[in-house]
């Protein structure tokens, strides 16, 4: 018995380990794993079904087929355990050993391992310094390779074909050694002296000048050092022994009908064994060379197919023409070992069913069908029945449950009480996709779900299914209750706003009950308290919308958290008074004294949570839901065709627009405007008309005429059903109503260009055939987009999770001083995001001073909450430096202070929170809502007409930012810089709005001027780009020869002539390299200079520029010399939506990126080359100038002699994030990427907190490139983890050596995931083969720091409750280890001990 217990004990033992190392296996190692050699290709005997001896399923090698029973049956039972049968040679043991015992095949000739050969870059090729092509020719027996040249003129590693080989043989006899096949490669690898080679390479690298050569050499050096450091030997990349997988992992299962299903691996192994045996026989027979060679080649191919079928040549196919699944295929891809079995497993104690509404449930409950519960909780029920003595054995209990006896239901109810279950809806896009509920037993077969959690699950009841899981252990139940209960997840982790927000019917009901109507029944009544209102309403004395006076007893929670009672009389409506009955104590009446739209309800719940806490908010949310359902039923809102009221002005607006379009058409016909201008104008026109129609329609819908108590006719807000739905936010939007009752508007073609003819009809009037046909474009594109979008969005989330999975909060404070500068995000005239919203929940990095003084009002280290936000607003603070994940200095992980508030909990983030995964989910989850392109509403194109002026919204003081301008004769300013901005500041000096001013804008105000709201302060022509003079003078044309560089156009109507610069492509040969220009001269004919420089005032004209002046005309400052027509707007396909987000996270370089100045200095142009201009920037401090060749077609924003600062835009275009990082630093990059990504999400109305994007950015900035190696072990140009460089530099600092210098590098998320320190995480993400090959060669260790690695090896993850477990284990390990002390410390301790004992 004792033995049995010991045996069982051994089985359950888990191995403790801290890291996993992967390496190459030596032949000795493979033999040591093996339990015997597989010599025959046979599997099992077809008559007896017993495994053949020495075959692929041999029991002698791999173990017995039945537990404790040898093959011939001589020894049976446990008592013979460990005996080896003398007849059949099988050891008596558990049959389970067939899953773990390996065999081996002794190969008659060495075989190269295909992974190290073909996985790029080829490791074997790098080591031998041969190309992959050459090595393959040797391996597959096409050429000889010289192994030992002896005293001949040949070189080691030289390739010889047959002729050359035989010539060499005749010439030198056997002074040299040249062979072919894997043996030759094995010999060459064996002969490498790593020490010597590494020394040689280290000397060679500093002496080479060519970049490519250095790259190649450092690659080789890295690989050699990896081999040297890891203890792998190069010759192990060529196999002489092949391991054989345990048979139970490649099973052979009998099907009915006498056939067998087998794993593909058996076929592949069989091929190898057959060819190997044949080769042995041929070698014994001393067969002719050519035959042996062919056989060796076939053996190499067979082993290739076994390891990675299809990597070289055609994949070997089975009987049914599909390629066989090799060992490599087993682990990679979605169906591979990593993703199918290690990262996600199917679990027991789970079930799934359709969901339906449970409007009567409480928030923490879900309805669970009895049948399901009975099955899920079976073991618990058996235990209870037995414990109660109702059943004597488990078998009896099982019978009772199967018969469904009445006492079983009682026991079930008891078991389920207080036992939470987890509900999950696929796709689980964020952590709220799994929540815990207390089950309530219900009849029927569908799970009932509380309506308020639908938003979190993104569930609806049109046939969605959900899965139920039972947490078994006490700890699991505890976590489910404390962390995952739906009542604990009121706020969304993405933005910190409530996610338990009523929608649709509930909103409709609450909105309906809080609306007011003029002259409703009971208007003007006064009530003593809420109960009286209730009675009046129920008895029909007062209508729900009647305006009444009510005496309210409200309890208000003060700053100190105490409730103070307050009684007052308020003007309100009956419905609002009724709603106040469910509002928890502590909130004032004003929160419900308004019509409750969706936004207001969300605000109310948020406010409630912050004021009265979690418990009351949950109860309140439930009450709101019940109330909302009740009153939406009472309201009886429905939609009929008559609700779509078409505005009377529609016809007038459309006729006016049509006339204008005709006018533009005639201008085009007479050549006044170009095709592009016509197109732009027409589209602007219709966009405007559409807006007017929808304004008229909304105005029309939102008001209705009623008679008040005095008998006068007055306007009141309409009770039109459709208007109420849209207005309350229950369903529908203005854009949709516009299509129903206004006009459908402009449509886009599939390629994104807008069709000029709009659809003037709406759905109520109905569409004609042409209009219907135009509509189909958008509708179909919408459907196609949706299908693509879902897949793309899921893939984006997967990449994000993978890059950020190991980012966990590991300490409270990293002590950094750095942070990001936050200011309100102002776009156009609007403050898109005020400062308060951006800093809420962040920690201040540097003291905030009162504007205009040096009094500290917020000390560094303060966590900004709602109260502080209000305070900053009151103190009119404009910018704050906050801690950020990007600047956090924690080595592994991130610190709580840099992260700030845990958005889903509302307090500082806990240690152990997996902030990386939360960030990834928060960004990925709304991905499906992002369109693929940005401009669709059912195909209706939304394009605002191009801005041509700045009209300020608020009054205030004008501020001009980095605006270069000249003053025109009439006193107006003309902008001559591109980065100029105009801002309006209020009386406190806070910026309220900010606008970009394009080049050539005419500005009618000056710095410091006061303006009134609505004033137009700047104007420009949006369709052309002017060139403005900066001095007075006379025009002189340079290189403007008619018919060669320019062509003259005369307008028939006006008789004016324009000169148009020809495109270099269309010019005759003589004009190709001439650059037409306009220069300014004085009366004496001397060149005028630009003010403040010694550069002549000369303006080069790009292709298609139009000049209206004649040679010799007089111009004054600020005049326009030439116009460049701007391109038509093809809804300037800003890659919208999802692709844009993916591009930013992948850090892709845009096609034609903007060109930034590399250094600060003065611009000049050097000698031109064919098709390119040479731009030279000369620094003002006299250091070396910087040169860059720029294609001639790029339109430059700078003129000769202009001063630029490092990082300024020289030529417009989409920004390249890598340039921003290199020239402007990390914080500018962070600002750019955060704003760009937020713009995409904001367009869709999705709110995501900045810190999630910053968290991902931190992971993208993990790597640095070594620019100078100093005394470190890094090589210049190496990409290494920032933490590695910092650690090594610290080490070097203590030894007074030179540290390495480095530049930060931005990696895209895919690349960053693949270059993580953990090879398990990288291999389970993508490119499994490549990752594992690289890891094996370098002998990598995975310290299992991230979440993914720990899931794969089946441990608790080092986050959340698992972090405590991991740190405890680490502490235990450290206790076991002796502490390391330096010699000096030991000496000091010793002397101290001696001294003290001496006393």
Swiss-Prot record:
Cofactor, free-text remark: Binds 1 Mg(2+) ion per subunit. Binds 2 Zn(2+) ions per subunit.
Cofactor(s) demanded: Mg(2+); Zn(2+)
Keyword Transcription: yes
Annotated positions binding Zn(2+) 1: 70, 72, 85, 88
SUPFAM superfamilies membership: beta and beta-prime subunits of DNA dependent RNA-polymerase (SSF64484)
Residues binding Zn(2+) 2: 814, 888, 895, 898
CDD domains hit by this protein: RNAP_beta'_C (cd02655), RNAP_beta'_N (cd01609)
EC number(s) reported in the record: 2.7.7.6
Keywords: DNA-directed RNA polymerase, Magnesium, Metal-binding, Nucleotidyltransferase, Transcription, Transferase, Zinc
Subunit organization: The RNAP catalytic core consists of 2 alpha, 1 beta, 1 beta' and 1 omega subunit. When a sigma factor is associated with the core the holoenzyme is formed, which can initiate transcription.
Protein name: DNA-directed RNA polymerase subunit beta'
Organism listed in the record: Pseudomonas aeruginosa (strain ATCC 15692 / DSM 22644 / CIP 104116 / JCM 14847 / LMG 12228 / 1C / PRS 101 / PAO1)
Organism classification: Bacteria, Pseudomonadati, Pseudomonadota, Gammaproteobacteria, Pseudomonadales
